[in-house]
Amino acid sequence: MTILRNFLTCSALFLALPAAAQVVYLHESDGYNGAINNKSLEPKITCYPEGTSYIFLDDVRISNVKHDQEDAGVFINRSGNLFFMGNRCNFTFHNLMTEGFGAAISNRVGDTTLTLSNFSYLAFTSAPLLPQGQGAIYSLGSVMIENSEEVTFCGNYSSWSGAAIYTPYLLGSKASRPSVNLSGNRYLVFRDNVSQGYGGAISTHNLTLTTRGPSCFENNHAYHDVNSNGGAIAIAPGGSISISVKSGDLIFKGNTASQDGNTIHNSIHLQSGAQFKNLRAVSESGVYFYDPISHSESHKITDLVINAPEGKETYEGTISFSGLCLDDHEVCAENLTSTILQDVTLAGGTLSLSDGVTLQLHSFKQEASSTLTMSPGTTLLCSGDARVQNLHILIEDTDNFVPVRIRAEDKDALVSLEKLKVAFEAYWSVYDFPQFKEAFTIPLLELLGPSFDSLLLGETTLERTQVTTENDAVRGFWSLSWEEYPPSLDKDRRITPTKKTVFLTWNPEITSTP
């Protein structure tokens, strides 16, 4: 059956290739282990204008490779497209000790595509192993990694940018700007990759990331003495990123960037003029940013529709920004603030802000069927309008309560809230605290803008307003009220804008709501 499968697959691939393309079949014997092989591995160099296709008939493992030449690698392409057709085999690189551009695969010609497709397991670990290495995959053309069961990039280094994948656009080049497309892979991991430039894991002009299973960018790091950003991913000036989660969750956690000895958490950095084209997840899936997004100043403001539908396919999942994974000493504004300088519309599903984060946008609006959830201490900050249709606030604790904030900064900006729903954590042991024996009030929500006329508050609702604990130890109900405050000076003598505050009051020993 395996022989028949290989024959049919290879025949189909062969028919799809240009007539003059070079086809190379790879067997287990094409692997290499420098720990037991005294002979140096000769680079596989291709230069066919019509393209080269490597078709796998067996698993191929390449490990413990050491090259003394500065420009050496394992696979080097100098002309035409380069295809690696996996045929459900394993293809792994491990412990590559080389300093060439792209220790594993180097595609050195623009306006081409490097494709790795249909593998059971595709892995680049410590490839390269050395800090002076220059990344696992380097391509002047576009890179496509697709339809594989498991794809892993772990522990790779680059003395330039993008320790896992780097697709630079060379100044003066007449080639089109390269892109990276990661699509249809069922398990995708980028972990512990380190670069000395932009993008700890990936640096490219355009990135399309479409996941079909659990995926993560974890503990990647970018550092430089002068200029560094994009702990996991860096998007070049004028570029774009599109994220679509079709199954499972996509998680960004523990990614950092350092400059001048200062280390901050960062998942994705958009350089000047770069933009999100899509940010979406299907129902019961999500994108979780435990590290912030950063965005260089942009003179052109573009639209971003979060959870935008695609034809008949809807996206009703969760896009989450959270400070949950920060250690106590890491809690600061830089590690909690995500910036996307675009006009954002929430089309469906849930946008969640939790654990003290701030989300800074150019403007925000949402469709009525979508939900914005904010936990105490979080902020939605917009230069322009902040038009919120449906806000949910979950109360877990009333001690040291910090209000939710929605703020618009421009002089003509508007803050509007159509519906506010306040819910309480499902456990009731909280009511055993002594403060519930007496009435108290906490500031729940602050709307801040240029004037009273710019702050519009609509319907407010409470879940479980009536509370009765076991043995009637605590009885009472919650209520909402609001007040307006003119501009003032805070304790640091900074101007606080016009404010409308919604208060949450606990009323004890009441047997029925008034």
UniProtKB/Swiss-Prot annotation:
Residues 1-21 form the signal peptide. One of its GO terms (cellular component) is cell outer membrane. Keywords: Cell outer membrane, Cell wall, Membrane, Secreted, Signal. InterPro entries: Pectin_lyase_fold/virulence, Polymorphic_membr_middle, POMP_repeat. Pfam families: Chlam_PMP, ChlamPMP_M. Its main location: secreted. It is found in: Secreted, Cell wall; Cell outer membrane. It is a peripheral membrane protein. Belongs to the PMP outer membrane protein family. This is Probable outer membrane protein pmp12. The lineage of its organism: Bacteria, Pseudomonadati, Chlamydiota, Chlamydiia, Chlamydiales.
